[in-house]
């Protein structure tokens, strides 16, 4: 066998070695994503082997075959991500591209595309058969994200295109591989897409892609830290420290967008598309115009091409001055930005919100850019490139103050956007006045420390001591070292033995390892039943998340057709004999107005009747009614008949999603006791506190009459008749006010039960997510025992099972049918174990009224 010349072998090794290092880095990066569950909900990891293997094959192919291979690989990614819906997406996409190239007048093609968009919009709103039927909501969002902006750019450039472009390139522009899992996608420019394809040496582009992906992972981890540990609910904001954290974290959550966009561009670089960065050191912007140039650069370029330049040229043609033309064109850009964000929201979620809060946000930002532009065009303006200017203390101080001011401004604006309520926002800022002198001093020292660090960093940057931060090009060996070292450190930090050795810092690292709701949003999941605006308005920040079919059905029950409003402290109740769709399952009520089977109002002889009260988990939100823990427990009681004195067992489920302690009391007094139960079982979760706090705050702010004893508790907490809802929430959350309300509710329920000869029993069910943010078992069970109730402790019911396997939906902490089966098994065991507390006689036991041990 003829051996290859040494020179050839060496040349091949020189090519293969960098490719091998790149593959190794990719495997490490995707391992980091797996260990920390980064972008788990997007499905990125399902494409990991396709991306890594596809890169290896793509890089080895002759250049002429790479683009067709990338297109085929992208279509494969769409199939993996969307299943059979990918066929419809591909067919519709090819049809749209074909319309762009019809041999008819350009205006006719634009009209056809616009007509297609209108039909698609109607399909989204009305559900036209054949368009949305059988096609997932996510597939619709992905398809829309492929074309809603890119086809505008494509048609704009197509009109001036003179060079023949292969069909594989044209289709690849729309069917970009990462778009299969990221519907919220950067607006890639058609010209840049073509121009940057292998515009640098391949290995340099590939390694840049790896570095961008790693940087994206870092951004996502930083976002997760901000989201889990810094973001706060408005009612938890009080004083200078929490106000500062609330403002800053509102702007810092943009790291999520930045991380995703870095990932997208990094993946595309692996296949030769050397696209520019989408976001660049945006937290260091020194002016509104500087921020506009740094943040979401693709959007800025899109607006310049489609709106700014045409508007500017049209104004110039009308003999309007250059200064006025630039200012007016900038105004056009920001009006268009406001409208197009709603347009984007429509395609991704299905609603077209035009709120004045958004108008103010974009209006203020646009006005700042206009003023900044006017100042730069003024006769005294002087632009000095920081790179060419020498360093001076005065220049450094000015620049750092501008950066700090811009960060503060954007933090304030994003907090305005996330709060959604001007009165609440102003109240939060006003709470700074109540700060202690020591807190103000510490805050001032912190600001000074940041300022000094900024001046030092400014000096270091001018001396070239950047450690590669912000550089778009690094030597291959240095880039590989940084990526490998960073990935290995992250993987090491995920090891349990390392985390244990780090103490509290290790616990913080552990908290970053999974995708979950933070304290604020976990509370919102409960509070949403009361605060319709939280769930029906658009998101609290511009980080769009596409909802699939199950998630889109997460409508608070108080906003559904299943309830009627009572006009008093109960707020709402279920309508009798009604079937509606809610949280992925049919919600059917019986003639008694409860979500349960039909039962006679009068208890029949030989029947043992349990009444059940609680909130959404107890009502079995998201689960099939006949497979809820209540129904399963009832079936087993009737099958096994633990007490031979009873021939029939009934569990009447009076629970209603969104109810709090005060509504448990009203439900007991108005409904439960009317049906002569033997036992009242109170289903309790730690989340009951957040629901109760928001519900009572809503009622108190509207001066709805409350129980005199409850009103007295509110007055003791300093809650007057004229207090606003945010102030009421804050005062309810301070001290032991919620504990007093809970104790009052349990005591009142127990008293009413004893008056009617009913046994009150307390049942604690742990949250699927976590109890770490709310009072838990000890406090709640202590109050229940003090009220004379027996206590069923169901903690540990989910042990041994992955929590994600038991959740109704990744964004919904309600248990699914598997979770309900676990609860039913445990509840039945507890009923047998504490049979005397239930007034049951099983195998020689004698009944007793309560079990407070």
Placement of each model-derived feature along the sequence:
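Short, solvent-exposed loop/turn and secondary-structure capping segments
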Residues: 346-351, 621-625, 663-665, 691-697
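Serine-dependent acyl-ester chemistry module
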Residues: 517-531, 685-789, 794-809, 841-844, ...
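Generic structural signal for small/hydrophobic residues in well-ordered secondary structure
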Residues: 150, 183, 341, 615, ...
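Membrane/wall-proximal cationic-aromatic binding patches
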Residues: 516-644, 800-802
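Histidine-centered active-site loop/cap adjacent to the catalytic His
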Residues: 810-853
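Alpha-helical transmembrane signal-anchor/signal-peptide segments
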Residues: 498-516
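Internal alpha/beta domain cores that form substrate/cofactor-binding pockets in large enzymes
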Residues: 609-611, 636, 641, 647-675, ...
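Membrane-embedded transmembrane alpha-helical bundles that form the catalytic cores
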Residues: 2-495
